[in-house]
Each structure stands twice: as C-alpha cells, then as structure tokens.
C-alpha cells in the first residue's frame, strides 16, 4: 500500500511495524478461533439442509452467506493473513488454501462465482462441501468440547447425500 502523505514519517514506521508483526504468539488463539467457527457453523449447515429439503431459497441463501463468511474468517485468522486491502481479501484467502484446491472450488461455487452453478440449490450444496472441507482442514484444532457437534453435523451432511 502506498502512503500518499507522511510529513513526519510516522505512517511509514507504522506500516513497517504492521508488516513485521510476528503472528506466532497468537497462533494458539487463532487455532481456537478457527475451531469455534467450524462448530458455530453447524447451525448454518442445519439451516441449509432444511432449506434444501423444503425448497426454500431464502433460507439456503442466507445460511450459505453466513457459512461462507465464517469459513473465510476462520481461514484468514488461523493462517494469520495480513489483509493489506479489502480488495485483496478473497484473493489472499484463496491463495493461502490453494487456487486449485477443493476448498477454493467449493468457496467459489457457494459464493456464486461459478457461472455454471448459480442456482440456490447448487450454492447450498457447495456451502455444505465448504463446511466439510474446512472442518477436515481444522480437524486437529476443534476442541473436544465441540467434537460431537461437528461430527454430528458432518454425519448429517453425508446422510443427506452431500459432500
């Protein structure tokens, strides 16, 4: 990011401090946050499954939005991504997971970025896949106290024929 005006040089110092920040002291908290987000999105999975079963577009889309937003935040925080601009948010997260990964394909489909799968049913199914892949990616980070919720949610997704 280019600093436009910095008469006394303080902005340059602040910018450098942000770029040099060491995330390692926060990694355990970031891991915990990611595990909490996966568990918390079990509710969104239930809403998506229910909406798909009932053919209720608004339920699926709103729950998909919540799930995708939370999974993006979980990855960004857990990986300690420095978001240099909101315009790079999605790029940085996709790059950190891998542009050609199943996770990125599921994210893009759930977010409606796949022109061949823009119907709400496809987006809901992609969101369920995104949840499953995020839960698997963060499996070691999910605390034992949340394990039953996440495992039950994963079972429901598979039982419903998704993932």
Tell me the role of every PLM-derived stretch.
Residues 14-30:
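Membrane-interacting alpha-helical segments
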Residues 26-163:
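Conserved nucleotidyltransferase catalytic core and NTase-mimicking acidic/glycine-rich helix/loop elements
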């Amino acid at each position: 990011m280019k600093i436009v005006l910095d008469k006394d040089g303080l902005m340059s110092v602040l910018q450098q401090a942000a770029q040099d920040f060491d995330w390692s002291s926060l990694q355990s908290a970031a891991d915990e946050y990611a595990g909490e987000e996966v568990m918390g999105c079990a509710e969104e999975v239930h809403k998506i499954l229910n909406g798909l079963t009932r053919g209720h577009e608004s339920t699926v889309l709103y729950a998909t939005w919540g799930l995708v937003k939370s999974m993006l935040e979980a990855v960004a925080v857990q990986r300690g991504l420095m978001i240099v601009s909101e315009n790079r948010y999605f790029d940085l997260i996709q790059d950190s997971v891998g542009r050609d990964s199943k996770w990125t394909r599921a994210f893009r489909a759930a977010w409606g970025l796949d022109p061949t799968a823009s119907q709400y049913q496809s987006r809901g199914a992609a969101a369920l896949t995104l949840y499953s892949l995020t839960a698997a990616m963060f499996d070691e980070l999910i605390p034992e106290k949340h394990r039953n919720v996440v495992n039950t949610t994963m079972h429901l997704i598979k039982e419903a024929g998704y993932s």
